[in-house]
Regions:
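Hydrophobic beta-strand positions that form the internal "hydrophobic ladder"
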Residues: 38-40, 86, 149, 188-190, ...
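Beta-propeller blade signature
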Residues: 4-12, 52-63, 102-120, 201-210
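Short, conserved, GDST-rich strand-edge loop motifs in beta-rich repeat architectures
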Residues: 1, 41-51, 88-110
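Blade-loop segments of beta-propeller domains
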Residues: 1-45
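Repeated scaffold domains used in trafficking and secretory/extracellular systems
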Residues: 22-36, 70-83, 132-142, 173-193, ...
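A short beta-strand motif characteristic of beta-propeller blades
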Residues: 15-23, 63-70, 122-133, 166-172, ...
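Blade-level signature of beta-propeller repeat domains, shared across WD40, Kelch, NHL, RCC1
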Residues: 235-262
Length: 262
């Protein structure tokens, strides 16, 4: 594709900082803060040979590139944490290419969820810790908090708790069909959307984790400011501890914040 320039605007309360990025060569659909700069990810990447093309690129606050790496095809979300680690979830069509011992291209499928400890580090994949206890067909929901990460992968939606060292626990979860997640200690709010009477509905199913199980404790239909019902599917679905950020399909400039009850 033709190279293009872009401007990133980072907002912090009433302050904002603009970063000019020059010569971008991929369609980057994912973005997050990374140090004083930003990191971008291209969701689709056709890798056919070694060396593998890079589809995640980091920039400093001056717009200069500080590094890049290959992160596979089929990225669902790219999120960074307070320690500078990079978390990437994948949808069901995802694949991850690698160099086999003979130097040719090998491909693995449905990687689910991966973590990089920094630019250029080797990836860690959640399936390496969970084995066949968890199916990572599609990482429907992920919440990257300050110290812990939670994921609910399709098809069984177990609640997988992860830290910087790996998987801490796998909890059976009766609340299936969740595409977003807000977390506060042992309380979990599972977001989903569906169509009812030809109109989109955004909903929350509340869960409590105790004694190694998740129990559903309530349900809630969400409305937008002004008691307005959403007009489209929810997009974004960025979970940060007790906060879930959402926007309506087709309107990525207007975001809404859901907070788990304190």
């Amino acid at each position: 594709m033709p190279r293009y320039d872009a401007i990133v605007v980072i907002c912090d309360n009433e302050d904002d900082h603009q970063i000019l990025l020059r010569g971008l060569d991929e369609w980057f659909s994912e973005i997050d803060a990374f140090g004083d700069g930003v990191i971008l990810g291209a969701a689709r990447m056709d890798a056919r040979e070694i060396p593998l093309p890079h589809n995640v690129v980091a920039f400093g606050d001056d717009g200069d590139r500080v590094g890049s790496f290959y992160a596979g095809d089929g990225i669902l979300q790219l999120l960074t944490d307070a320690g500078g680690r990079i978390w990437i979830s994948y949808f069901d069509e995802a694949s991850y290419g690698f160099a086999k011992p003979d130097g040719t291209l090998g491909v693995s499928y449905m990687p689910g969820l991966a973590r990089w400890d920094g630019i250029g580090s080797d990836p860690w994949f959640a399936y390496s810790d969970t084995g066949n206890q968890v199916g990572w067909c599609d990482c429907y929901a992920v919440n990257v908090g300050r110290t812990l990460v939670y994921a609910c992968p399709y098809v069984d939606f177990p609640l997988v708790e992860i830290d910087a060292s790996g998987v801490r626990s796998i909890t059976p979860n009766p609340i299936t069909r969740c595409t977003g997640l807000a977390v506060s200690n042992s309380r979990f709010d599972f977001f989903d959307h569906y169509r009812q009477n030809d109109a989109p509905v955004w909903s929350i199913r509340k869960g409590l984790r105790e004694g190694g199980v998740v129990t559903e404790t309530g349900r809630e239909i969400l409305t937008l400011p002004g008691s307005r019902s959403p007009t489209g599917w929810a997009r974004g679905k960025i979970g940060r501890d007790g906060t879930l950020w959402l926007h309506e399909d087709g309107n990525p400039r207007q975001w809404y914040r859901y907070e788990i009850d304190s």
